[in-house]
Amino acid sequence: MKETPKKVLVIGSGPIKIAEAAEFDYSGSQALKALKEEGIETVLVNSNVATVQTSKKFADKLYMLPVVWWAVEKVIEKERPDGIMIGFGGQTALNVGVDLHKKGVLQKYGVKVLGTQIDGIEKALSREKFRETMIENNLPVPPSLSARSEEEAIKNAKIVGYPVMVRVSFNLGGRGSMVAWTEEDLKKNIRRALSQSYIGEVLIEKYLYHWIELEYEVMRDKKGNSSVIACIENLDPMGVHTGESTVVAPCQTLDNLEYQNMRTYTIEVARSINLIGECNVQFALNPRGYEYYIIETNPRMSRSSALASKATGYPLAYVSAKLALGYELHEVINKVSGRTCACFEPSLDYIVTKIPRWDLSKFENVDQSLATEMMSVGEVMSIGRSFEESLQKAVRMLDIGEPGVVGGKIYEAKMSKVEALKYLKERRPYWFLYVAKAFKEGATIDEVYEVTGISKFFLNKIKGLVDFYETLKILKEIDEETLKLAKKLGFSDEQISKALNKSTQYVRKIRDQSNIIPVVKLIDTLAGEWPSVTNYMYLTYNGTEDDLEFSQGNKLLIVGAGGFRIGVSVEFDWSVVSLMEAASKYFDEVAVLNYNPETVSTDWDIARKLYFDEINVERVLDLIKKEKFRYVATFSGGQIGNSIAKELEENGVRLLGTSGSSVDIAENREKFSKLLDKLGISQPNWVSATSLEEIKKFVNEVGFPVLVRPSYVLSGSSMKIAYSEEELYEYVRRATEISPKYPVVISKYIENAIEAEVDGVSDGNRVLGITLEHVEEAGVHSGDATMSIPFRKLSENSVNKMRENVLSLARELNIKGPFNVQFVVKDNTPHIIELNLRASRSMPFSSKAKGINLINEAMKAIFNGLDFSEDYYEPPSKYWAVKSPQFSWSQLRGTYPFLGPEMKSTGEAASFGVTFYDALLKSWLSSIPNRIPNKNGIALVYGDKNLDYLKDTAVNLVKFGLTVYSISELPLQGIETIDKTKAEELVRAKKVEIVVTDGYLKKFDYNIRRTAVDYNIPVILNGRLGYEVSKAFLDYDSLTFFEISEYGGGI
């Protein structure tokens, strides 16, 4: 019999970090929907302001608080839920659940854990308990021993035998894990590994070099009924984290015996931890015989379960929530197919490929090799009817400037076979591009296998693409059959045109004349074997007819955000989903085009139609030809939509909202700067970098520092502050590489200025605007800045000038829809530095802070005009809201943590408060690993910028009860100093509670900053923020814990 609790508390995952991303927005949203269907009151704790999940329609009550046990206890005390779900918020939620159990909070308030119980979670996540459980159940695990100290680890590694894999218990993204080939390797890194475990435990395991890694996803109900939903094959071998791996589903190289044996083991693993809901089980398979080991299991929704859900069309999170309530598998209907029960195991008539996306170029000193720790910030998922088609589509989806596996920058680069094989041995990201290059330069299958361990099945497929492309290159014209084969192999019009040395228009014209067009296929989870109703589609050239008839009417296509990267994350998915809902009032049919498996926008029940496919001009034109969309919306999905807006308009596509020509003016630094001059709007002095002589002349006039800004980029890509001629020329070179078609603008960098922004909506005549103020000074990228609503330090006079400037731009560019304007304010004079004619990164925050959905208002503005009489309207603030960045320094091996004009954060958290400091502290504490320092501990405060703020920070921390040291090489007046060597020793000994620093000091303090983040010690990288946070520590006892509506926020 199923349980029906009256009120359930759902724990979210907090801000996005590497290895814990938007998949938990998707899974948490589905869990909340499943609970709502049962008439259960829901309470959500999640500080991630950017998510769809933290909108009021999902949970009955929302608490935007740090996802830590003591904050959740306050909610439990107030709300008194009957049950708690901890399996839908990643490792963060599981850790909170275990803490609440161990501290007796759940028992005290009579709160029942729904789904897999705490003892099952501990069996799965403690490496030692998992190993013991597998052995007790006669399930195969690699030779291994656990350790809780450096000495024990070294002793056990000798017993197991080198090389060893060090796995970390209760851990996220493989943080701290490693392969140690020698005792010296182990000694060097074992302390970090132990520091990254929530329970201080590691497993020393025999390293299975070049074994195949596989994952199975399994559902299990309270009666023990199980369904295996997917088998996912990692192309990268053991030793590369699964989140870093290119994967395919269904698995391609297993024979039936291997598949069935591991399927049986998967069900046994689920039984051994008494799973109720969903888990994934990871296996290692010896490529030379029938030998396999169980590696680990995650007893919760995970990144791979989100992928499996989107790959198969099976709603894992929804079903898992129903099972947690006590339903049996046969009682739950698969909402995607609409006809089958959840006990049906999916069958696929297509191949899915997932590729991670890295942004390592943004980080100094970062280790570029793929290994046991996850470093990718996003992923893409493609669907095709051959491996080649699926892989090539996925490469284009990465949006890294490569047209497919072959024919791009790496393929045509000057690189020898030896160099290509060297890159492969080093396991660089996007290895398949180097595989293709190696084959082009004459490498054999065996040579590539030797350095990569990638199955020869896949290597042969990539070699086939190389051979075909090289054949294409010697053709003068292309015949119909060859063109058809090229499209079936996943070649884009751009790739084909490059091979033939023709234009893409030429290739498209031949395709149209020959009627070589893609067909639309449905994903129904059953490979067409069973009747189903579905709205989940992809395009392929490996088919003869469409699976559906296309409707007529007033239709809209919304372009999604694609794969996440630094600067494009879940906040843009919030905008896409908000637009879907708002647009349904104005259109007969709304479809979305996106390919990110982590998101809510790619869920089956959000859009009327979901096209899981590429976002580029070729694919959008294909869809318009079939669907006859009246409008295409490119403004909600971040930079990717804006990048194709102008070309779509040139091809006759009607864009919803602001015109492509206006977008081009805003995105082109030179055109935009000239427009500001024309309107008499103040901006920092600038020059377009057309020649080095011009740059020299400009710098001689304005002096250093200057800012180097490329065009058409997001997250400040290659945006740098240059303090010398040498830096300037290097930064100009890089900026020209990243955006070669557009001019680079050099502008004067205004020091010690306040940075502020306006998120807004316009109908071309009036503006609805929300002002945000940064805590850090101008020069820190807005995505890395701490923001407050309302503003604090800006004068009313400055804000009124900002509003006048915004209104002038809205009217001049005829802005219709959402926008964001960034200012630096010095001596009460605002200077515009940027205009984005799209939904912005901060829009979920500003919307939720003011209680007004700017995307809804954007649709009103486009179709009906804004409904207020003033030229410019800003809704009043009832309380304070503060947004803080989440950095993932600890995942990015070796990188130097510092802040500048190029974005480095991976996520954001926000909180509300009755004072600025109430909101600030809860927001800052929401980002991992931030915490309140233990009194009587040590703080390090030093730097070469914002010295007055650093000194006041130190004074506040002394008042709070810490012993504060500055560093003798960078002394602060009145603060006790120690030398750098002593400071490094204190950090390594984990005696330091917090580090507050400012400036770029890599040659001086690399070891301090790096060791601090490796050991999970909070680090504040800006003196102004350090001052405000240290002041907030003094008011720690007066934090408030209200539901979002009580602060007047939420939408």
UniProtKB/Swiss-Prot annotation:
Q: Provide the binding site for ATP 1.
A: 127, 167, 173-174, 206, 208, 213, 239-241, 282, 296
* Database matches in SMART domains: CPSase_L_D3
> Which amino acid positions bind Mg(2+) 4, per UniProt?
834, 836
Q: Where does Mn(2+) 3 bind?
A: 822, 834
Q: What's the short name of a Pfam family annotated to this entry?
A: CPSase_L_D2
Using the chain's own numbering, where are the disulfide bonds?
Answer: none
Any idea where the MGS-like domain is? 930-1051
Residues annotated as binding Mn(2+) 1 are: 282, 296
**Protein name according to UniProt:** Carbamoyl phosphate synthase large chain
Q: Which organism is it from?
A: Saccharolobus islandicus (strain L.S.2.15 / Lassen #1) (Sulfolobus islandicus)
Q: Which gene encodes it?
A: carB
